[in-house]
Amino acid sequence: MSIFRFKKFEVRNEKSAMKVNTDGVLLGAACPVRPDMKNVLDIGTGTGTIALMLAQRISALTQTTVSSIDLNIIGIDIDEDAAAEAGANFAASAWAGSLEARRQALAELSDDRAFDLIVSNPPYYDSSLTNPDAKKTAARHTDETGLSFREVLEFAGKHLAQEGIVSMVLPADQEASVLRHGRMNGLKLAEILRIRTVERKPSSRIIITFIHDNQTVTPTEKQLTIMNKGK
């Protein structure tokens, strides 16, 4: 049995094609949250790790007990096994009443609520290097088989609450493209966190956060180095 243990919850990591990984954990830990966030959507939830981290962080900011918190986090995934595993992980957590897992594609999501926070760790591998395992291909590749950040931004442009935010973790070389597609969907940059493994290397990942383009904000840039020493 594969179990990943966090400080306040555990994640079973057996069925989902996309396992617990550094990118997802960084997004769950670093994306902006506020205590007034009530409706949250995790697109491509996998094991549910990001959703669980957000439940922990948002609930910690409120003054209410876990059992009475007004928080609804939906994790969707197109893979049946992933959705089932996320659901089991949610049910075993302290925030079971605030978390819901659905086997559902983003295009099929009919929920008409406005989301205060939308997060995603979308696929990014080159589609020419597909894995023979179809489930892993869908989880890892941005093409017709899987989710793309373009879909996330298009959805966010229509379903983000007025003061809501959308945050994604992506390869650093996709920065220009994701900024362009954000603008195309009425979104503008609020924050970008550049992530590198060691100081001597360039950033390999970014956590990029957008808001509606009618909101007033001065974009911020931050740098995170994962290891203090290394090659």
At which residue positions do the language-model features occur?
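Mobile active-site "lid"/loop adjacent to the S-adenosyl-L-methionine
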Residues: 122-151
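Short, structurally constrained coil/turn elements
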Residues: 5, 67, 95, 183-186
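SAM-dependent Rossmann-like transferase core, predominantly class I methyltransferases
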Residues: 2-39, 45-57, 206-209, 219-220, ...
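Conserved SAM/SAH cofactor-binding pocket of Class I
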Residues: 29-131
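SAM/dcSAM-binding transferase cores
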Residues: 197-231
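Conserved Class I SAM-dependent methyltransferase catalytic core
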Residues: 16, 20, 146-203
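Residue-level signal for inorganic ion chemistry
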Residues: 27, 121, 152, 210
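General small-molecule cofactor/ligand-binding pocket signal
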Residues: 12, 74, 100-102, 190-193
